[in-house]
């Protein structure tokens, strides 16, 4: 059913399937995006009440892999999205993301059960339940961030290796930059910022190589006159660095 894979003993992909269904429902109903915070993670979503964390990650995948193919596979129960995901990253990444979304879903269900149990428990028992709930919340936060980082690095590392034209360079830059609008962030989260700066440096070098006909030995970066595109890349990197510095100073 949907994006789920069934074995004799377990259903895989339930978290991704639930998130995709909710994203479709929110889009049909016309729910507007809202900034929310769950378990220390801040992000923008059009599903603030139902599976918000799962929807945030699924929305990242929809942006990178394609919203149409995600919804089509959900409705028709086929592997088109799965195959495109694997082609854009790897089978290992797909399985890790699928498993992580399931883990988040089940951990949230455990929190609901524990909250219900707490209403019928003694004070000492409640203290133990509260500790368990906090552990689950922290586990969810860490799983979310690890999964988000994996999605970023796996997709954009693969895409970088496929760049073969100057047009590809610009498309890559724009797609990585716009990913910021899909991020879930916590206090002190820097992975995306650090990755972006690193990739912009590599992209600058890649651009120079392609502009010189693919001949890396012909480059003389120090003496090369910067063009408008290279200047743009450097300005974007400086903006990220300046923003990070200001945040540190404000603390």
What role is predicted for each listed range?
Residues 4-53:
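Post-HExxH zinc-binding segment in Zn-dependent metallohydrolases
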Residues 21, 213, 224, 228-251:
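Non-Sec secretion/translocation targeting segments of pathogen effectors
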Residues 44-209, 213-215:
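Pan-zinc metallopeptidase signature
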Residues 1:
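Short alpha-helix carrying the canonical HExxH Zn2+-binding catalytic motif
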